[in-house]
């Protein structure tokens, strides 16, 4: 399974090489506070890509590295294989630590954009994130579910920025024994 994941990362990430820009019309948040963003986030909705296809219970965990970069651990449950998949990466700020514009690598020198374009500034409970173009979109939250108003805000804002919100996938977070046993594991 790790070989398959490595192959997928090898095939996908080169396509993102040099894709550390921001999609037209999308501005990263300013006044960003990385210490408040660290920790576990649940993927609520996304535009689908091969590297996440078929995954449920998807989470991302962000922590500071000794070198000042951010450690990223993405996890998801592969429904068809009945197994957990995990990828570890590194994120670096593009415009300084107070701007939600980062580049993320899960494979060597190849980086893709990670643009936080909307954020719950009061409590850091949700974030709207884009990649290098409008085919990459995520709604992340601190809890496995969010109020419908947040989802509606996400859809409205994303649609106004050119994302195809009709293709959103809403990620299942369940309470299967496997999910409970693995979801609580924070590294």
List each model region and its residues.
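A beta-rich soluble binding module of mature secreted/lumenal proteins
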Residues: 19-187
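Bacterial N-terminal signal peptides
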Residues: 7-15
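Positively charged n-region of N-terminal signal peptides that target proteins for export
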Residues: 1-5
